[in-house]
């Protein structure tokens, strides 16, 4: 292998990729440049999907929109470009991921210094022979040519003048711009200087580009000199590594080749013995694995839009080329591990995000392998017939039915020397849009009515959610604001019917899936719909959501993608519900039957027929039994059979439920077998953990158990743990002491409350002594009606009795008050009548009850002493006044 021979040849020049990177940054750091870490591949610039150049992080500085980080800067910037993706692996130097070494001047040094340093770095640090170097300048940049020729000393015959298309940089139609100068390496200097053609990439490779930003271009194309001139340079790390390591292409440098070796090892092949076709596949794998590893590290996840689509496309190309070289099993985790190990020294964040990177690689690979296997089988049948080309209809069927990307069909066709009828593909897509419009209904009803009528007029939705969680679909119907519509725009809440869907529609107690619909949309700029519920109406699935971006119209093709995390939680909860019913039958009563259920993303609820409460001990047994089944890792068996076969096998059905002739049976062997149309885990171990939260009664003879499973258990326990931590902090005890401490506090509180009640009673008696003077004479009787707040019922009774004792047997005492003056929601009224009043037929119990009604309450008691309560403190004064009037009339 060429790399191993070239990395060390006895001299001190940088050779490895790491050495080249370090040498470049050190060279400019020693010349007062601030070393700037690589920015993310996800740029801050909203007009650009990915970081495509080393200067992109500094673009706001060059455009005058941000302050410069320093007068001089240098960086090694990771970049991604996919405009030439079809050339990756087929040419010596095309890549998707690459590192751009750069030095920058923000209004500091300019052209001559930049050229001199570039030459010094190239010839003295990297040790390249000037005889192997050629430079280019813009055709009108006499200054640059003069510097190269007279200051640096480059042979004039090896200075090439180039047109604007090659050697003039501009940020856009207007704004900062300027000429460029490039340094090329000549692999064949013996051919001489008379016939130099820089387009000959077999002889020349451009490795260092110097941009001199010295002009501003106005709307009419006029160039005026900039007051502050800037320098932007870029050296391709991979290209310099190829030159210094003496290998035939960038892929066989130490920067990429270890990944090729890893992939070749997984395939059981010797890369150096392969033909060009085989080598191309391994080059694609090596290049793309660097790209997707860094994309995931920088927060990009696979999707069908924007940078997420770029990552998905790259990842799928890796899997596809892996299969071409015989790697049939999932291998992206191994490639991800190798990529991290290769690049972690320069990018430590790869290690920090290792788990995230590997998890995303595994998920997306598994998802695509399903699609790939189905599509390749169909495509193989097409190719057996030796067609002249793959028809548009065939390509569309692969795309529409099997989710096979068009570009992948094109790539496979090209490998067989065929083309794809793209015009026919577009026609097939348009025909589907027309069919969708013809199938759409036109109604003007309320939302529910609209959905019901729509469901009645449409064919049943093809549900694919047992097999796939993502697939292309066509929009058949739209409802906006309760009316059918042909299109919906950003901000609209919509109900959408698709011809087929991976989304589970709410039924059998399980909630509908969440997720996203995405596609090109009618505006061509992309549409995104968040789906937050799915319901079923006559086997038509209605997706409830909101248009987040773009415009959606009838006939549009969208990619339906279920939120996998939500689906996994629902699956765990649904299978846990089956285990719960089995445990209840085993622990409590074998005759227990289901009365209802709820399977949500973060909780589950199971209602069952039972005449008594489930004891705490039984709940512990149920919980232990279920967690035991989870840890035993039972594989679930899901199959369809006739209802008679299912019942004969012992499958549990819900009483009163109507079932079709053919039913779906979910079997946890030896544990549970139920008729069920919901989604479930493949193995009980996927549930993780099960925890009962509550047991209660919902109706006569019906009990309810609420529980959590999977990740929700951790959230529940964390919440409980947080409560305990706060208690420990407040009580200043250890966990083992908390029960004893709380019991002690309860006793202290009980004692304090008893003492407080006694104190209030004494206070009431003390206060009441002064009230005796307020009694008024009504004939031969004494009447006292007064308000006394801040006293509980017992204290108020003591006060009334004490006043009656002072006033004698011919007295009537009525007291009212608020036990808590700040709470007008609780009123207490007390009446104490002497023997003479009772002899006249007056009774304290009846009297105080009638008065309490004025405060929104009631009560009563003995003829001589009674207490009542009320809920309206604002009416208390009026009630006491009424008591005074009523007694005056009764006693007068």
Curated annotation (Swiss-Prot):
Alphabetically list the UniProt keywords: Aminoacyl-tRNA synthetase, ATP-binding, Cytoplasm, Ligase, Metal-binding, Nucleotide-binding, Protein biosynthesis, RNA-binding, tRNA-binding, Zinc
Q: Which organism is it from?
A: Prochlorococcus marinus (strain MIT 9313)
Q: What is this protein called?
A: Alanine--tRNA ligase
Which InterPro entries does UniProt cross-reference here? aa-tRNA-synth_II/BPL/LPL, Ala-tRNA-lgiase_IIc, Ala-tRNA-ligase_IIc_anticod-bd, Ala-tRNA-synth_IIc_core, Ala-tRNA-synth_IIc_N, Ala-tRNA_ligase, Ala_tRNA_ligase_euk/bac, DHHA1_dom
Does Protein transport count among this protein's keywords? no
The cofactor binding remark recorded in the entry reads: Binds 1 zinc ion per subunit.
SMART domains of this UniProt entry? tRNA_SAD
As for family, the record states:
Belongs to the class-II aminoacyl-tRNA synthetase family.
Gene behind this chain?
alaS
Single GO MF descriptor: aminoacyl-tRNA deacylase activity
């Amino acid at each position: 292998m060429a790399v191993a021979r070239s990395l060390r040849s006895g001299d001190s020049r940088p050779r490895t990729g790491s050495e080249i990177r370090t040498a470049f940054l050190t060279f400019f750091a020693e010349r007062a440049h601030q070393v700037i870490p690589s920015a993310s591949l996800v740029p801050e610039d909203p007009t650009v999907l990915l970081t495509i150049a080393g200067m992109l992080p500094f673009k706001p500085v060059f455009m005058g929109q941000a302050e410069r980080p320093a007068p001089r800067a240098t960086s090694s910037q990771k970049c991604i470009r996919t405009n030439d993706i079809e050339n990756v692996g087929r040419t010596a130097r095309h890549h998707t991921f690459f590192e751009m070494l750069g030095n920058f001047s923000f209004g500091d040094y300019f052209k001559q210094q930049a050229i001199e340093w570039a030459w010094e770095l190239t010839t003295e640090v990297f040790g390249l022979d000037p005889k192997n170097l050629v430079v280019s300048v813009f055709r009108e940049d006499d200054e640059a040519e003069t510097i190269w020729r007279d200051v640096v000393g480059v042979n004039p015959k090896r200075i090439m003048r180039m047109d604007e298309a090659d050697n003039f940089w501009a940020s856009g139609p207007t704004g900062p711009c300027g000429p460029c100068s490039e340094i090329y390496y000549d692999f064949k200097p013996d051919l001489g200087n008379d016939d130099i053609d820089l387009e000959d990439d077999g002889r020349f490779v451009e490795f260092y580009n110097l941009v001199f930003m010295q002009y501003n271009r106005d709307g009419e194309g006029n160039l005026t000199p900039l007051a502050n001139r800037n320098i932007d340079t870029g050296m391709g790390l991979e290209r310099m590594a190829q030159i210094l390591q003496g290998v035939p292409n960038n892929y066989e440098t130490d920067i990429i080749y270890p990944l090729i070796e890893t992939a070749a090892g997984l395939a059981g092949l010797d890369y150096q013995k392969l033909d060009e076709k085989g080598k191309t596949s391994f080059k694609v794998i090596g290049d793309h694995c660097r790209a997707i590893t860094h994309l995931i590290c920088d927060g990009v996840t696979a999707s069908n839009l924007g940078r997420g689509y770029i990552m998905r496309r790259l990842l799928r190309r890796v899997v596809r080329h892996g299969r071409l070289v015989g790697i049939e099993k999932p291998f992206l985790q191994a490639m991800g591990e190798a990529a991290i190990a290769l690049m972690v020294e320069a990018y430590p964040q790869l290690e920090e995000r290792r788990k995230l990177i590997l998890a995303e690689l595994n998920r997306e690979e598994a998802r695509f392998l399903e699609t790939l296997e189905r599509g390749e089988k169909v495509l193989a049948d097409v190719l057996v017939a030796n067609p002249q080309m793959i028809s548009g209809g065939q390509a569309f069927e692969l795309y529409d039915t099997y989710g096979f990307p068009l570009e992948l069909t094109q790539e496979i066709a090209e490998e067989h020397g065929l083309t794809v009828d793209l015009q026919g593909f577009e026609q097939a897509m348009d025909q589907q849009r027309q069919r969708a419009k013809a199938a759409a209904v036109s109604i003007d009803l309320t939302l529910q009515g609209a959905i019901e009528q729509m469901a009645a007029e449409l064919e049943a939705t093809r549900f694919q959610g047992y097999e796939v969680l993502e697939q292309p679909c066509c929009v058949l119907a739209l409802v906006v604001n309760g009316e059918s519509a042909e299109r919906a725009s950003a901000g609209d809440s919509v109900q959408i019917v698709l011809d087929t869907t991976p989304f589970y529609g709410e039924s059998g107690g399980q909630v509908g899936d969440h997720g996203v619909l995405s596609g090109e949309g009618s505006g061509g700029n992309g549409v995104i719909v968040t789906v937050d519920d799915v319901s079923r109406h006559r086997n038509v699935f209605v997706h409830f959501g909101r248009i987040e971006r773009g415009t959606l119209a009838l006939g549009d093709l969208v990619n339906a993608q279920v939120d996998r995390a939500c689906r996994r939680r629902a699956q765990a909860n649904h299978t846990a519900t089956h285990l719960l019913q089995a445990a209840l039958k085993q622990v409590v009563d074998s005759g227990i039957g289901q009365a209802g259920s709820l399977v949500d993303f973060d909780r589950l609820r199971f209602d069952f027929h039972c005449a008594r409460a489930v004891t705490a001990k039984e709940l512990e047994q149920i919980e232990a039994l279920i967690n035991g089944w989870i840890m035993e890792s039972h594989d679930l068996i899901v199959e369809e059979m006739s209802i008679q076969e299912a019942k004969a096998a012992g499958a549990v059905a819900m009483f009163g439920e109507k079932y079709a002739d053919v039913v779906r049976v979910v079997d946890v062997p030896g544990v549970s077998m139920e008729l069920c149309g919901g989604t479930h885990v493949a193995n009980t171990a996927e549930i993780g953990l099960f925890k009962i939260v509550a047991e209660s009664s919902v109706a006569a003879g019906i009990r309810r158990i609420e529980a959590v499973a999977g990740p929700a258990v951790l959230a529940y326990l964390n919440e409980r743990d947080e409560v305990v931590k706060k208690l420990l902090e407040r009580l200043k005890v250890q966990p083992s002491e908390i029960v004893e401490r709380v019991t002690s506090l309860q006793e202290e509180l009980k004692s304090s409350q008893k003492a407080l009640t006694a104190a209030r009673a004494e206070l009431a008696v003390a206060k009441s002594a002064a009230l005796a003077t307020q009694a008024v004479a009504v004939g031969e009787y004494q009447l006292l009606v007064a308000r006394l707040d801040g006293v509980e019922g017992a204290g108020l009774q003591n006060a009334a009795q004490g006043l009656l004792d002072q006033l004698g047997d011919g007295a009537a005492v009525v007291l009212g008050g608020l036990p808590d003056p700040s709470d007008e929601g609780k009123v207490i009224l007390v009446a104490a009548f002497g023997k003479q009043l009772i002899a006249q037929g007056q009774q304290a119990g009846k009297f105080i009850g009638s008065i309490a009604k004025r405060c929104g309450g009631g009560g009563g008691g003995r003829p001589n002493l009674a207490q009542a309560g009320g809920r309206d403190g604002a009416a208390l004064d009026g009630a006491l006044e009424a008591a005074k009037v009523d007694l005056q009339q009764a006693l007068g």
